[in-house]
A protein has these predicted regions:
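A short, flexible helix-boundary coil/loop motif
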Residues: 97, 101-102, 125-135
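Hydrophobic side chains within alpha-helical segments
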Residues: 16, 89-92, 126
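Generic hydrophobic alpha-helical membrane-segment signal
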Residues: 1, 22, 76, 111-114
Length: 135
């Protein structure tokens, strides 16, 4: 799991995702993502990295989805979509409780440090919940 901050330009999220996948994937893997990642370029580059993209299909009359039928028919695709909903809850927590909906800091470096701190706080909460469940 990685957490990185970038500028909001419409392409940076996908570029960072591919960069992180290239650094961390050493065997066949899958990646789940929302509709914003359903582009031919992103899907093709994921396949080059031997990563199966489980991206929510962007259904629109003028544009076809970059995800083909052999991916969506697989039972792992439906499971990934379910897990993605749980992950979206984490993003909601980071934005609301963690305070990262709008940054208070100037500069990418300071914002990145704040994001790491919020991520660490969330992980500590998860550990506390797991310990409570184990007892």
């Amino acid at each position: 799991m990685d957490l990185r901050v970038s500028e909001a330009n419409g392409y940076a999220e996908r570029e960072l995702a591919l960069e992180m996948l290239g650094e961390h994937v050493d065997r066949r893997a899958t990646v789940g993502a929302d509709r914003g990642y359903d582009t031919r370029d992103f899907v093709a580059r994921c396949r080059q990295l031997e990563v199966t993209p489980h991206v929510v299909q962007y259904e629109h009359a003028r544009r076809r989805s970059a995800i083909d039928g052999r991916t969506t028919r697989h039972e792992g695709y439906a499971l990934s979509l379910h897990i993605r909903m749980q992950i979206e809850r984490i993003f909601g927590w980071v934005k609301s409780v963690g305070g990262l909906r709008r940054t208070r800091f100037r500069g990418r470096r300071k914002t990145q440090i704040a994001a790491y701190l919020v991520g660490a706080a969330y992980n500590l909460l998860r550990v506390a919940r797991l310990r409570r469940c184990a007892q």
